[in-house]
Regions:
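The feature captures the beta-strand-to-loop junction immediately N-terminal to the Walker
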Residues: 57-59
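Helix-to-loop junction immediately C-terminal to a conserved catalytic motif
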Residues: 72
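Conserved ABC transporter NBD signature motif
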Residues: 80-92
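Short coil-to-helix segment of the ABC ATPase nucleotide-binding domain corresponding to the Q-loop/switch region
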Residues: 109-118
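Conserved ABC ATPase "signature" region
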Residues: 127-147, 199
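Conserved signature/switch motifs of ABC ATPase nucleotide-binding domains
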Residues: 150-153, 171
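Catalytic Walker B motif of ABC-type/P-loop ATPase nucleotide-binding domains
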Residues: 176-179
């Protein structure tokens, strides 16, 4: 049975005022509508603290990627506001690193050159030797030093995603936005890169917002998990989607993949999220 006091599940209605005051990222009443009568989602509000890792889970079409694109400055909401570090987000910025499911590497450049391109965009006046040292540091963090002078066509899918992650970290953004970055990878590669990401985030204290469909991935990586529902027709008319519930992850932050299943709160937490996806993931 779900234990609210132990697993600290909070409904959106009971917002935490103290968190909103001190939060690094603040989303206020975000809505997106392609048709005025049927918004994809509405009244989406949540926060992220500096150094926090937050995952969002929901079925396809609920608007997760749209929210991430708004946070990245790549799309505009129909209404609402996004504030990061006290300033409203307006357009793309190197202060926010983005990693998509597709690697988006420039095929004619090597790993070194792909990441150096991003570094030079961030710091145009950085001397070439320093750029090279900087690039090598972040390539090493994702375990690709041996492939640094290879082109994308010479890399596996997992290696390409590692390059994308290294590139995002190399510009030292204030926030990292991940849109299902491991969704196209096999289970073994996905697990390996998840572990690498977890260690890098812990070492750098990076703030991360990540979309995933993988419940275990969210439980492993996230401090909090946002459960998002789809818009739906109801007897009272159409109700748009939104954030239905915010779940605080009660598991210790030093959790590991191998030890996850042995933690007392793992199965109650997992069962609650799965139950939401199966029975409550549409607006009522």
């Amino acid at each position: 049975m779900w234990n609210d006091s132990r697993l600290q599940s909070d409904t959106v209605a009971s917002k935490q005022e103290s968190r909103a005051v001190t939060s690094f990222l603040k989303i206020e009443k975000l809505s997106k509508a392609y048709s005025a009568a049927r918004p994809v989602f509405s009244d989406v509000s949540f926060t992220l603290d500096r150094g926090e890792f937050v995952c969002i889970i929901g079925h396809s079409g609920c608007g997760k990627t749209t929210i991430l694109n708004v946070l990245a400055g790549l799309d505009e909401a129909s209404s609402g506001h996004v504030f990061m570090d006290g300033r409203e987000v307006s357009g793309p910025s190197l202060e926010r690193g983005v990693v998509f499911q597709g690697h988006a590497l420039m095929p004619w450049l090597t790993v070194r050159q792909n990441i150096a391109f991003a570094v030079k965009s961030r710091w145009p006046d950085m001397p070439a030797p320093k750029v090279n040292v900087h690039v090598e540091k972040f390539v090493g963090m994702v375990g690709l030093s041996h492939a640094i002078d290879k082109k994308p066509s010479q890399l596996s899918g997992g290696m390409k995603q590692r390059v994308g992650i290294a590139r995002a970290f190399s510009i030292q953004p204030k926030m990292l936005l991940l849109d299902e970055p491991f969704g196209a990878l096999d289970a073994l590669t996905r697990g390996t890169i998840q572990d690498e990401l977890m260690h890098i985030v812990r070492d750098t204290q990076q703030t991360v917002f990540m979309i995933t469909h993988d419940v275990d991935e969210a439980i492993l990586l996230a401090d909090r998990i946002l459960l998002m529902n789809n818009g739906a027709d109801t007897p009272d008319g159409y109700k748009p989607g939104g954030i239905a519930e915010v779940v605080n992850n009660p598991l210790p932050r030093n959790r590991t993949r191998s030890g996850l299943h042995h933690l007392d709160d793992y199965y109650p937490l997992r069962n609650h999220i799965v139950d939401f996806l199966v029975t409550r993931a549409t607006a009522h």
